[in-house]
Amino acid sequence: MAVRASFENNCEVGCFAKLTNAYCLVAIGGSENFYSVFEGELSDAIPVVHASIAGCRIIGRMCVGNRHGLLVPNNTTDQELQHIRNSLPDSVQIRRVEERLSALGNVTTCNDYVALVHPDLDRETEEILADVLKVEVFRQTVADQVLVGSYCVFSNQGGLVHPKTSIEDQDELSSLLQVPLVAGTVNRGSEVIAAGMVVNDWCAFCGLDTTSTELSVVESVFKLNEAKPSTIATSMRDSLIDSLT
C-alpha cells in the first residue's frame, strides 16, 4: 500500500529515507513521528534504522542500495558506517565509494536487478555498483535530465518517471528495466519524483502533499494493492535470471 508521510513538515520523504526490500534507513531528526510511520508499516518484515551519512540527514540522496548491498560516499564516517553495518542484515554488503558525484542517490537509481546511472559516473563506481548490488548498469538520461536518481523511481514491479518523458523514452527505459513505467508526479505536481517518495516491492511512502490521484497512480504502477513481502517470488525470479545468464 501507499502511505503519506512528512519529515518535520517537509514533504520530500525521499530525501530523508532509503527503502529497499531488505532494510529501511531513516534520517535522524526531531520528528519521531516520521520514523514511526515507517516502523508501523515495515517492522514486521525488515529492519528500520535511524542513520546519518557524512553528517547529513538527507540520507536518501547520499546513498544507493538494494537488497544485495548499499553504497555510501567516501566522506561517511567510520562510526556511521559501523552503525549501519551492525543494523542491517548480514547478507547486505556495505561499501564506501570514492566518487566525484558524491550524492549517489541523485546520480544512480536501481532495483534488485538493474541500475540507471548518470552518463558521467566514474567507471570504477559503475563496476563497484555492478559488483556490490549485483545489477546490470545502464548509462541513461530521463527526459533529458542527467540526474536519473532524482527523476526516476522503480522497484521490481514497476516505475514512475519524470512527467515530460516521451513515449519513446519510456518504452526504451521500460525494455532496459524490464518493468512497466508511467510518467507522473508526486507532492501535488512535483517532477522530482525520487525526492518525494520511496518504494519497495510491497510498500510506498509519499510526501503529505501527494494528491489521491497521484497516490492511486503510485499504487497501480508499483502493483501495491496485491503486494506483500514475499521471498518466494523473489527467489523464483532470482533462479530464473541465474538460468538465463
Curated annotation (Swiss-Prot):
Pfam families: eIF-6. The modification Phosphoserine is found at residues 166, 174-175, 235, 239, 243. Gene3D superfamilies: L-arginine/glycine Amidinotransferase, Chain A. Changing residue 235 to A: Abolishes insulin-stimulated translation, abrogates tumorigenesis. It is found in: Cytoplasm; Nucleus, Nucleolus. GO terms for molecular function: ribosomal large subunit binding; ribosome binding; translation initiation factor activity. The modification Phosphotyrosine is found at residue 113. Belongs to the eIF-6 family. Detected in bladder, duodenum, liver, esophagus, pancreas, adipose tissue, megakaryocytes and testis with lower levels in muscle (at protein level). GO terms for cellular component: cytoplasm; intermediate filament; lamin filament; nucleolus; nucleoplasm; synapse. Phosphorylation at Ser-174 and Ser-175 by CSNK1D/CK1 promotes nuclear export. Keywords: Cytoplasm, Initiation factor, Nucleus, Phosphoprotein, Protein biosynthesis, Ribosome biogenesis, Ubl conjugation. The modification Phosphothreonine is found at residue 165. GO terms for biological process: cytosolic ribosome assembly; miRNA-mediated gene silencing by inhibition of translation; miRNA-mediated post-transcriptional gene silencing; positive regulation of translation; regulation of fatty acid biosynthetic process; regulation of glycolytic process; regulation of megakaryocyte differentiation; regulation of reactive oxygen species metabolic process. The keyword Cytoplasm applies. It comes from the Eukaryota. Disruption phenotype: Embryonic lethality. Embryos die at preimplantation stage. It comes from Mus musculus (Mouse). This is Eukaryotic translation initiation factor 6. Its main location: cytoplasm. HAMAP family: eIF_6. The keyword Ubl conjugation applies. Monomer. Associates with the 60S ribosomal subunit. Interacts with RACK1. Interacts with DICER1, AGO2, TARBP2, MOV10 and RPL7A; they form a large RNA-induced silencing complex (RISC).
